[in-house]
A protein has these predicted regions:
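C-terminal segment of classical bacterial N-terminal signal peptides
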Residues: 5-13
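Transmembrane beta-barrel domains of Gram-negative outer membranes and organellar outer membranes
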Residues: 14-242
């Protein structure tokens, strides 16, 4: 059984790419900015997860987004806790009509024993069709250290900001490799709407299918609180904002 999921790296407890969405974009925020993403997910098979993911962007010669996701989850009748440190940096900036790239890497750990559960590395790519529409493609590698197996990670997402405050996201993602349960390597899907009334706060409502490899349906409610760097201009003024 896969036991961790961080951003695209997938498993049985948590993930964090763009809030509760699994497929990441190539962008990172400005140096000095921070955000707190949190969400609660519940499945038709009684699985459950509660996640908090604080992150900040620092300059260590190059802007790097550092985050530590923590989760409390119920899976296969058992409760558990994990945390997942991750570092992400942009390699090629995104822009309308061109492809941007980034890379991130990290791992997941059992919060009680400190045991290293997974190691992962993912390369997100983003193609912006316009100021209000983009396509995200993810590819990467996951090492499940519990069963000592390696997996290929993949993801495809589409974001459309169809009003000033509403954004639609559709995504398919998963992992390829040998697994004891067939559902672990079957594709996973999510569709959700983000309500973002201002640059500080947003709310996500997401429907998912098989998102932890358990062959169940999921409902997720998530929030993001953003803390921009001092004296920065609003994101919509800077970039056109998606």
């Amino acid at each position: 059984v896969i036991t961790a999921l961080a951003a695209l790296p997938i498993g049985d407890n948590a993930r964090a790419a763009n809030g509760a969405f699994a497929v990441d974009a190539a962008d990172i925020s400005e140096v000095g900015s921070c955000k707190l993403e949190s969400w609660i997910s519940t499945a038709t098979n009684t699985d459950f997860s509660l996640v908090a993911n604080p992150s900040c962007v620092v300059d260590i010669g190059k802007p790097v987004e550092l985050s530590v996701l923590s989760s409390r989850f119920h899976s296969d009748g058992e409760w558990g806790n994990s945390f997942q440190p991750k570092a992400k940096t942009n390699l090629v900036p995104t822009g309308i009509g061109k492809v941007g790239f980034s890379i991130y890497a990290g791992g997941s750990f059992d919060a009680l024993t400190g045991e290293n559960l997974t190691v992962f590395a993912v390369a997100p790519a983003t193609y912006r069709l316009s100021e209000t529409m983009r396509i995200n493609v993810n590819g990467g590698w996951l090492w499940d250290r519990i069963v000592d197996r390696h997996f290929l990670l993949y993801g495809l997402g589409w974001d459309w900001k169809f009003t000033d405050v509403l954004q639609l996201t559709l995504e398919a993602f998963g992992q390829a490799g040998q697994a004891d349960r067939p559902s672990v390597t079957r594709p996973r899907f999510q569709a959700g709407v983000r309500y973002r009334p201002n640059e500080i706060f947003s709310v996500d409502l997401i429907y998912g299918r098989n998102i932890m490899g358990e062959n169940a349906n999921w409902i997720t409610l998530g929030t993001t609180i953003r803390f921009p760097p001092p004296e920065s201009r609003p994101a919509r003024e800077r970039t056109g904002h998606l």
